[in-house]
Amino acid sequence: MTANEFILALDQGTTSSRAIVFDRAGTVRGMGQREFRQHYPRPGWVEHDAGEIWQSQLEVAREALRNAGASAADLAALGITNQRETTLIWERATGRPLARAIVWQDRRTAAMCEKLLHDGHGRMLQERTGLVVDAYFSGTKLAWLLDHVPGARKMAERGELAFGTVDTWLVWQLTGGAVHSTDPSNASRTMLFDLHAQDWSDDILALLNIPRGILPRIAPSSARIGETLPEWLGGSIPIAGVAGDQQAATFGQACFTPGMAKNTYGTGCFMLMNVGDAPVASRHNLLSTVGWSLPAGNATHATYMVEGGVFMAGAAVQWLRDGLGIIQRSADIEALAASVADTDDVFMVPAFAGLGAPHWDPYARGTLVGMTRGTTRAHIARATLESIALQSAELLSCMNADSGIPLSELRVDGGAARNDLLMQMQADLLGVPVVRPRVPESTALGAAGLAGLAVGFWSSLDEFGAQWQAERTFEPAWPADVREARMQRWRQAVELSKGWSRPAAGHA
């Protein structure tokens, strides 16, 4: 085995830590995965143990190397991708976390966000950061930690405290505290980062009463930022790529030109579209975010995305399984849905937790409409599957409108992307090809790609992109009038779901 033959990607997710060894062809050569504990100390609170994140990530990195038959000497570089927005603080001198990490799903700062909106800061925050004001993002989580963890604010003011998202925490640990760094894709999810200035916003830091000194420096997503301590993985490895998970997946899917987009089908769906070298202000309350930044001579060049999310995708299928008992396993839905030719005009709006973009109605609730005595469990299964494709098509239409760039094709990944019927539905509703890649590990591959570019493992974006291959392409079969009629019927069903749980006398 020759030196510098592989790239190691660390993929630190919400429920598990993973590590994957890739070769130059983008093929998986070894993998490790460990789940870790979720903490729910109060309703709406979600926490992770920072030490467990680090230990689980270190264990799976060693496991991936063993499974690949590789050592640190065989690695050209290491890349990191991570669950975004999750917020940590630790003592600079010791690396000791002062509290558990507040996870992106955690809602404890919802009231703080409502106050920011009530006080008239919403427009400024959205214009600067590209984000809607929400407890989802790191800024209010960090403010909460400084105000509620004993001694945290005084330590921050004395310069003794460090803040980071999960990527920053892992880099700190891997380098023994030598590097306190993040990248623009993660920084742009904090609600503290000015998209236009490509730096932390002093105005927002003042608004949230956060000392700038606790923030990490911002390095390009593809750049050699430090080296691992030899004791961790048996040798010193350059850390050369960092990106948030959804942006890394977009990079791994080689969506390098404006108009290219990917959709990750999981519990929910995450859609990102490349909009080029300037941020796009959404008219549909989609998020504007940095995809990645690459060195360009003495400067860096950022690529921007618009992002939309579907709350309930695979989760709606799980409800059919666990709530209704219509299927025994989630995988059973494809055969059941395929046993009927269509939904017989049945629509399922899976607004179990409200509706996200472009509707943003927290009072909407799950709705099944169009049923007759002839409706069967197969029709309901097909309508549920189709709801995933309908929601995604609606969001991608908004992305087209915001960006002014027509979608050329949709690249897909995630567990539900293996469902051939769903992928065909998606192509029919979009009117463009839906393409599933040969390598399904898009997120980790993106981190590997960013790291590999920084050290010359791949010489260019074109060379890295050339290893991307389609496993299957789903071509649209519906004419435009059929597609539009289906979308119009869907919009009718969505309107019926809105406002249902509003705590007022009447319903919307």
Curated annotation (Swiss-Prot):
GO cellular component: cytosol
Residues reported in the UniProt entry to bind sn-glycerol 3-phosphate: 14, 84-85, 136, 245
One Gene Ontology term of the molecular function aspect: ATP binding
Domain of life: Bacteria
Reaction catalysed by this enzyme: glycerol + ATP = sn-glycerol 3-phosphate + ADP + H(+)
GO biological process, one term: glycerol-3-phosphate metabolic process
EC number: 2.7.1.30
Record InterPro entries: ATPase_NBD, Carb_kinase_FGGY, Carb_kinase_FGGY_CS, FGGY_C, FGGY_N, Glycerol_kin
Residues reported to bind ADP: 14, 18, 267, 314, 415, 419
Keywords: ATP-binding, Glycerol metabolism, Kinase, Nucleotide-binding, Transferase
The protein's annotated pathway: Polyol metabolism; glycerol degradation via glycerol kinase pathway; sn-glycerol 3-phosphate from glycerol: step 1/1
Binding site for ATP: 14-16, 267, 314, 318, 415
Stored Pfam families: FGGY_C (PF02782), FGGY_N (PF00370)
EC primary class: transferase
Protein activity control: Inhibited by fructose 1,6-bisphosphate (FBP).
Binding positions for glycerol per the UniProt entry: 84-85, 136, 245-246
PROSITE patterns membership: FGGY_KINASES_1, FGGY_KINASES_2
Protein purpose: Key enzyme in the regulation of glycerol uptake and metabolism. Catalyzes the phosphorylation of glycerol to yield sn-glycerol 3-phosphate.
Family: Belongs to the FGGY kinase family.
Protein name stated in the entry: Glycerol kinase
Encoding gene (name): glpK
